């Protein structure tokens, strides 16, 4: 069954009504050529999954109704936070993809003293957005119920402070 994340969680009232998806915003639903009666999963990113059944397909819209809502059973019992030094080139993208697939709940890129990669604030924000998209895609592919957070790159001292504040059991 196909798995997607909602941009924002829906209220119980919104879930009771038929959901309409526009081609402009949900192109990937149309690419799959879903037909009436087929089902897919919408996750809210906070641990709830909604199984939806397609009720109507038009040229520029798709309508579905929620058949069942449940808690996601695919998450780890603990939170796994990855503090990752910035590697060369695009290796960080692969690292984030695999970390999300393995169950990481949060990923913090760290600028180390000997890292060859240096990012200013503008580049760091763009890089964080790109990495968040990769994390979302990996979470959809591995059918996660929670959308992992990818922080903007931090300095080593800030990452250590973040680790000290973590709830370690």
Where are the predicted features?
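N-terminal positively charged helical leader segments and presequences
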Residues: 1-71, 122
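RNA substrate-binding interface of SAM-dependent RNA methyltransferases
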Residues: 73-169
